[in-house]
Design a protein with these regions (language model features):
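Bacterial Sec-dependent N-terminal signal peptides
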Residues: 1-21
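Compositionally biased, low-structure terminal segments
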Residues: 5-7, 18, 26, 170, ...
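Boundary/junction segments of secreted and surface-exposed precursor proteins
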Residues: 19-40, 44
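Surface-exposed intrinsically disordered loops and tails
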Residues: 27-32, 89-124, 159
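C-terminal, surface-exposed recognition/capping segments
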Residues: 38, 42, 46-48, 55-84, ...
Length: 218
């Protein structure tokens, strides 16, 4: 079985979440820094095999889908958990020289085609052993094909009752909040509660990171 976490997006970023925690099946997972406790959701059978997701987005303070606390952090694709992903992090236009920047700021620069590093590396997030994998030990981000397999289960965009929206796959097997994104050019937050952008761990083509996205109009 393949195990995943959810990284949420910044015009190039994302993490997974669902409210359907089954206490009879799930077990606690503790991240390396000990700040968050995640739980496994029941397995989901897809055309890409059996997939197991954690119960919330990386950095989410709650798994209550009606709360903005379920939105979680906003990652730049391929970047490690270093503080840049926090919604209160500062921005900088200094492009990173290495895959582990010395600062914890969100890197913006309109001249670099949505990238935060001088020499992009397409393998920074491609599996659980990748250099910058942001997931708890043993977990990784879904691939583009795995996201498509989840979408093939069928989906529905639903209101939370608090003015925001979420998407439900496979008749409630996996629910994801519309957590919005952080603009790669400006650092501004956009579409919070209205759209969801979830990173894939692999790239669609050289230099082009993939993500699964949805909005309330669909």
């Amino acid at each position: 079985m393949k195990k995943f976490c959810f990284a949420v997006l910044m015009l190039i970023n994302t993490a997974l979440y669902s409210q359907n925690y089954d206490a009879g099946f799930s077990k606690p997972i503790i991240t390396e820094n000990g700040n968050f406790t995640y739980y496994e959701l029941p397995p989901i059978q897809t055309s890409e095999g059996v997939l197991i997701f954690l119960d919330r987005n990386l950095g989410a303070l709650s798994n209550d889908i009606t709360s903005s606390d379920s939105w979680g952090d906003l990652y730049q694709w391929g970047r490690a958990t270093d503080g840049h992903e926090k919604r209160l992090s500062d921005t900088t236009n200094t492009i990173a020289l290495t895959y582990r920047p010395a600062n914890n700021e969100f890197i913006v620069d309109s001249s670099r085609a949505n990238d935060w590093i001088v020499r992009p590396d397409d393998d920074l997030w491609n599996d659980s052993l990748s250099t910058n994998n942001p997931c708890p030990c043993g977990y990784r981000l879904p691939t583009e094909k795995e996201w498509r397999a989840v979408a093939d289960l069928g989906y529905e965009i639903k209101p939370t009752g608090t003015g925001a929206y979420y998407i439900s796959f496979g008749k409630g097997q996996l629910d994801l909040p519309c957590a919005g994104l952080r603009n790669a050019f400006t650092g501004n937050f956009q579409y919070q509660g209205m759209r969801g952008y979830y990173w894939a761990g692999d790239v669609m083509s050289k230099g082009m990171s993939g993500c699964m996205d949805f909005n309330k109009a669909e």
